Design a protein with these regions (language model features):
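PRPP-associated nucleotide enzymes
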Residues: 1-159
Length: 159
């Protein structure tokens, strides 16, 4: 079977939901200076945290590859994640960041797989709850491919 990508969340739905999340976050943080921590390939304040190797399953071992360059004490912090699966990475990260004494700390994710959760993390802003499938597009990749797709999709035909 040839490898294909099936659309799970169309481009228009992704754009609409991101706009809605942005409006809600702007409303919730009105008059405050929010410090974003993006657990992605890039962000405002960048922190690289991973529990994935080269495969499609979490390794279960969380590593911090790059830490923050500034203090969080007394600051309103919003962690932005692309996808939450088992919750291990975010549980570990939020525990570390809580010890740095932020004034507040909330979590935003574009995609959430609550049925895969093995660590309890409170997600304050969710784009989409999705089924337990390996997804690509909109920044998410499979073996360094499909990252630039404008929609969220599921790779089919992969063992």
């Amino acid at each position: 079977m040839a490898e294909t990508v099936k659309v799970l969340v169309p481009e228009e739905d992704v754009a609409k939901r991101i706009k809605e999340l942005g409006e809600q976050i702007s409303k919730d943080y009105a008059g405050k200076q929010v410090h974003l921590i993006c657990v992605l390939k890039g962000g405002v304040y960048f922190m690289s945290v991973s529990s994935y190797g080269d495969g499609t399953k979490s390794s279960g071992v969380v590593k911090i590859a790059k830490d923050l360059d500034e203090t969080l004490e007394g600051k309103d912090v919003l962690i932005v994640e692309d996808i939450i699966d088992s919750g291990r990475t975010l549980y570990y990260l939020m525990d570390i960041l809580a010890k740095r004494k932020p004034k507040s700390m909330k979590l935003c994710t574009l995609l959430d797989k609550p049925e895969r959760r093995v660590k309890d993390v409170k997600v304050d802003y969710v784009g989409f709850n999705i089924p337990d499938e390996f997804v690509v597009g909109y920044g998410l990749d499979y073996a360094q491919r499909y990252r630039n797709l404008p929609f969220i999709g599921v790779v089919e035909g992969v063992e």
